[in-house]
Amino acid sequence: MLYCLKKEELQKLKKTHFMPEFVNAEMLSATYVTDENAAREIIPKPLLPTKTPLATVFVARYPETNFGCIYNEGALFLHCEYKKERGLYCLSMPVDDDMAMVGSREQYGYPKKMADKITVEKTENRVVGSVIRKKEEILRIECELTKEVPSNFMDDVGVQTEDWDGTPCYRVIAFLYKYFPSPGGMGFDYLPRLVREATLMRKKGEVLEGRGEVKVSSSPFDPLGDVPVKEIRNIVYGKWHNTMLPGKVIGRAWNPFKFSKHAFFKTDVVPTLLQNYDPSAEKRAREIMKVARKF
C-alpha cells in the first residue's frame, strides 16, 4: 500500500542505495562568456563568480533512467566557486515530466519547471536543441559538428576522474540553494541550505564539437536573457552515462532576509504578482490578511 509502506518495504528502499542513473543521455551543450556584472549580481554569496564570467547551457534527451522516467531537459548554469572548488550555480532547468521535476527539485533544490516542448534533433552533422516554455523559445543551441573533442574539453565544467569501477569519467559539481516558503506565506520554512551535488559523466562513444549559435531569451517567467552570450567557448554533442551522486548541505543562509532577493525565480507566481501590483489596493489587502490569519 503506497499510502502507508510496510516495515519490510521501507527496509528494501533503504537497501537499494539509490542514485539516479541516466543511460545513453543525448546532450547538446555550450559554454560561453557572459556579462561580468550580471554574474556578480545573480550569484548569491558565499558562492563567488569565476574570474572569467562563464555560463553553460544544455538540452538533453534521457531515453533510459533507473527511476521510471523518460524525459527531456534543458538547463542554464553560471560558473562559480566555493572555497576554491569550481562548480555550476543552476538558474534554470525546464523538464517535460512531472516526476523528473519533483525529484531533483525537492531533494537537491534544482529550479525545475515544466516546459511546453524540449527537443534535440540531429540530421547528419547538424544538431539543434530547443526549449519552449509558456509559448516562448527560451533556449536554442544550433551546431554544425566538425570534429571529435580534445581531451581537455571539459576543463571549464568539471574534472577528469574515475568511478568506483575504474571507468574514466568527469565529475561536475552543482551548487544549489534549497528552501521552501513557510505555510503562512511569511519568510522561509527553514534557513535556506547551500547544497553541493556531484554528477559523474561517462562518455558513451564519440563526443563531437563544432561551430554554431546559442540563443538565450527572456520571458516574464524565465529571464534567461539576463545571462547574455558574449563569446562562445565551445558547443559539444554526444551520448553519456550519467550518475547523480548523493548531495550534502555545505552551508546555510544565516541572514534569510538578505538572501531573499535570490529566492523568487523558481516559480511563476512572483512575476504575476509584480505585474498585477496595485498600490491603491494595498491597505484593504492588509486588512483582509490580518483577518485571514485568525481563521
Task: Tell where the protein language model's regions lie, with residue ranges.
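Short, positively charged
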Residues: 85
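Short, extreme N-terminal leader segments that mark the start of a protein/domain
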Residues: 1-50
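Short, solvent-exposed aromatic-acidic interface loops
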Residues: 91-102, 134
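Broad gene-expression machinery/nucleic-acid interaction feature
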Residues: 73-77, 90, 126-128
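Interaction-surface and assembly-scaffold signal
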Residues: 9-10, 106-295
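Structured loops at beta-to-helix junctions and adjacent beta-edge loops in soluble globular domains
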Residues: 33-35, 60, 79-81, 94, ...
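Short, structured protein-protein interaction patches enriched in aromatics and acidic/basic residues
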Residues: 50-81
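A general secondary-structure signal for short beta-strands and their flanking turns/coil
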Residues: 25, 71-73, 124
